[in-house]
C-alpha cells in the first residue's frame, strides 16, 4: 500500500481522477474558458501520461504533476485544495535529481505565481498568446553551482 502523503508515479488509469481535478479548477476559475469537456480531458491525459514523468498524490487523488523530461518542463500541476501542501509535495518530488526546471503559467494565475516564487522559481518571459490563446509567463528554477 502506498503512503497517501507521498507522491507516486501515475498511470493511464489515473487519467479520469486527474481530469476531474482540472475540470473542477476550470469550473471555479472565472478567467479560464472551458475549451474541453471532462471526457476530452480524460482522453488527452490517457494519451499523454505514457510520455511524461507523471506524479499523483493521494488516494483518492488530490493532485498531480506532469513533467516533460526532454524539455525539463512542468506541463501541468493541479491540486484540488490549494494552500495545504499538496503542490509543494509534488513539486519537491519532481525537483529531485534535477538542476533545471521550467514551466509556463497563465498570466492571470497570480496565486500560482506566488507559489512558484516561494518555491525558488523566477519569472523569465511573457508570451501574449500561450498554447490556449491566454497570455502566459515562463518560470525557471535552477540550482546554481
Short names for language-model regions:
Residues 4-20:
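A short beta-loop-alpha structural element at the N-terminal edge
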Residues 15-45, 50:
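Conserved GNAT-fold acetyl-CoA-binding loop/helix
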Residues 56-69, 73-78:
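Conserved beta-strand in the GNAT
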Residues 74-85, 105-106:
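A short, internal acetyl-CoA/4′-phosphopantetheine-binding micro-motif in the GNAT/acyltransferase core
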Residues 83-96, 114, 118:
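Conserved acetyl-CoA-binding loop-helix of GNAT-fold acetyltransferases
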Residues 96-109:
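Conserved GNAT acetyl-CoA-binding A-motif
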Residues 104-106, 122-138:
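Conserved catalytic-core motifs of GNAT/GCN5-like acyltransferases
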